[in-house]
């Protein structure tokens, strides 16, 4: 086996032959897949670019965050949440669960391993994964667990660099409304994050203006004390999807009235059908709707342009703001490092639609790209572990026990 260092100033390149799959990402997706593989007797190696597990949850989320779904819909495979956890665990409780999950399954990711590129080598039948520290990892299997929310997404809005007021940040940098106290804040994006950040701003005596560019479904988080999501999942077992959607919209109308009057136009497609077709989730209200009705959260149309002091809007209005927060979601970063192949789109999502997007070719797998949250992650992890577990067992039966963990250090002669 030969090695050709990319960095000629560093004369040594490490090549590591991995005993089992390489998993990229130590978030919930990577942890769940590693645990499921372990339960099938398959070892794995997780490479994580940050210095901890679940770095997105740990450092890129706001303080008041709680799971929007009940905990039994958010558990990872093979380990329940502690019984004493509340129905909707907090961010810190979820992080503690993930830490205990990693400890329980003895998952030890290699941290601060930023993958520069990964490509399949047809001559050897191995995936070659190169990290920033001049190390190359080789395996027959590559599992992409970086997910659909790897990097912050900013929409293309003219003038963003012109703004000279206060802060202009992505929601991933937002922690609490305390730093925006008494400010007039523009919140761009009306998903769950945008709604909840606006709620938090009001509670810290700020004045949020929430941009709603497109149609959006807003549902109550609970119906008569029962999770709306849970009600929907139960009804789908015996009723057609469109009937379930009609029921959910009836409950929403009873809770909020006609949201069009508030500037929140509903899509023509029902919430569950829209989720299945586009992956766009409905907003589950945790208190923002009452503040919108009272006028404490003001709804604005789409932003046409960011100005030096604020923004111009599609309806012709122009307003000044002290700060701007982009609650515009995240994007996959797969295209920046995965080389070759046509399994992913240019946006970094599997071309094969749910529920079959977890399997690529030549030992490539993906987990966390279903647009179905932690439920989708758990489903992917179980399927991947099942398929690789079968391949692993067949290899053992075929006397391939000599594929053991090996470490080689090559020194360039150039």
UniProtKB/Swiss-Prot annotation:
MF terms (GO), sorted A to Z: flavin adenine dinucleotide binding; indole-3-pyruvate monooxygenase activity; N,N-dimethylaniline monooxygenase activity; NADP binding
**Which top class of enzyme applies to this chain?**
oxidoreductase
Task: Write out the catalysed reaction.
Answer: indole-3-pyruvate + NADPH + O2 + H(+) = (indol-3-yl)acetate + CO2 + NADP(+) + H2O
- On whether Flavoprotein is a keyword of this UniProt record, the answer is yes
**Biological process annotations from GO:** auxin biosynthetic process
Q: What is the effect of changing residue 25 to E?
A: In yuc1-4; loss of activity
Q: Which InterPro entries match?
A: Auxin_biosynth/cation_transpt (IPR050982), FAD/NAD-bd_sf (IPR036188), Flavin_mOase-like (IPR020946)
Pathway listed: Plant hormone metabolism; auxin biosynthesis
Q: Which cofactor does it need?
A: FAD
Tell me which tissues or organs this protein is expressed in.
Answer: Expressed in the apical meristems and young floral primordia. Detected in the floral meristems and at the base of the floral organs.
The residues that hold FAD are 25-30
Residues binding NADP(+), per UniProt: 189-194
Keyword annotations for this protein, in alphabetical order, are:
Auxin biosynthesis, FAD, Flavoprotein, Monooxygenase, NADP, Oxidoreductase
UniProt EC number: 1.14.13.168
Briefly explain the null phenotype: No visible phenotype, due to the redundancy with the other members of the YUCCA family.
Record family assignment: Belongs to the FMO family.
Q: Any idea what job this protein has? A: Involved in auxin biosynthesis, but not in the tryptamine or the CYP79B2/B3 branches. Catalyzes in vitro the N-oxidation of tryptamine to form N-hydroxyl tryptamine. Involved during embryogenesis and seedling development. Required for the formation of floral organs and vascular tissues. Belongs to the set of redundant YUCCA genes probably responsible for auxin biosynthesis in shoots.
- Protein name per its UniProtKB record: Probable indole-3-pyruvate monooxygenase YUCCA1
The organism named in the record is Arabidopsis thaliana (Mouse-ear cress)
Q: What is the lineage of its organism?
A: Eukaryota, Viridiplantae, Streptophyta, Embryophyta, Tracheophyta
């Amino acid at each position: 086996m030969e090695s050709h260092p990319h960095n000629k100033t560093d004369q040594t390149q490490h090549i590591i032959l991995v005993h089992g799959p390489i998993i990229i990402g130590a978030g919930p997706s990577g942890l769940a897949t590693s645990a499921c593989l372990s339960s099938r007797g398959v070892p794995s190696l997780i490479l994580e670019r940050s210095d901890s597990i679940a770095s997105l949850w740990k450092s890129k989320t706001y303080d008041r965050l709680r799971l929007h779904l009940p905990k039994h819909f958010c558990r990872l495979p093979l380990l329940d949440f502690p019984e004493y956890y509340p129905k909707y665990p907090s961010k810190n409780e979820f992080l503690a669960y993930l830490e205990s999950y990693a400890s329980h399954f003895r998952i030890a990711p290699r941290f601060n391993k930023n993958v520069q590129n990964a490509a399949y080598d047809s001559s050897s039948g191995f995936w070659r994964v190169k990290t920033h520290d001049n190390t190359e990892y080789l395996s027959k299997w590559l599992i992409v667990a970086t997910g659909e929310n790897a990097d912050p997404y900013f929409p293309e809005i003219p003038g963003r660099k012109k703004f000279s007021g206060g802060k202009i940040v992505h929601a991933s940098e937002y922690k609490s409304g305390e730093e925006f106290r008494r400010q007039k804040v523009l919140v761009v994006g009306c998903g769950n994050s945008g709604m909840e950040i606006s709620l938090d701003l009001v509670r810290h005596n700020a004045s949020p203006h929430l941009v709603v560019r497109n149609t959006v479904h807003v549902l109550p988080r609970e119906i008569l004390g029962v999770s709306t999501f849970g009600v929907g999942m139960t009804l789908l077992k015996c009723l057609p999807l469109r009937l379930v959607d009609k029921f959910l919209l009836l409950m929403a109308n009873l809770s909020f009235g006609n949201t069009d009057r508030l500037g929140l136009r509903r899509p023509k497609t029902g919430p569950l059908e829209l989720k299945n077709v586009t992956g766009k989730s409905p907003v589950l209200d945790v208190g923002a709707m009452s503040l919108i009705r009272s006028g404490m959260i003001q709804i604005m149309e789409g932003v046409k342009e960011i100005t030096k002091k604020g923004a111009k809007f599609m309806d012709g209005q122009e307003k000044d703001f002290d700060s701007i927060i982009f609650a515009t979601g995240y994007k996959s970063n797969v295209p920046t490092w995965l080389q070759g192949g046509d399994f992913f789109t240019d946006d970094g999502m599997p071309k094969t639609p749910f529920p079959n997007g977890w399997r690529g070719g030549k030992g490539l797998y993906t987990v966390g790209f279903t647009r179905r949250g932690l439920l989708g992650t758990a489903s992917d992890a179980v399927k991947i572990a099942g398929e690789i577990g079968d391949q692993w067992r067949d290899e053992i039966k075929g006397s391939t026990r000599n594929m053991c963990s090996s470490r080689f250090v090559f020194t360039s002669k150039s």
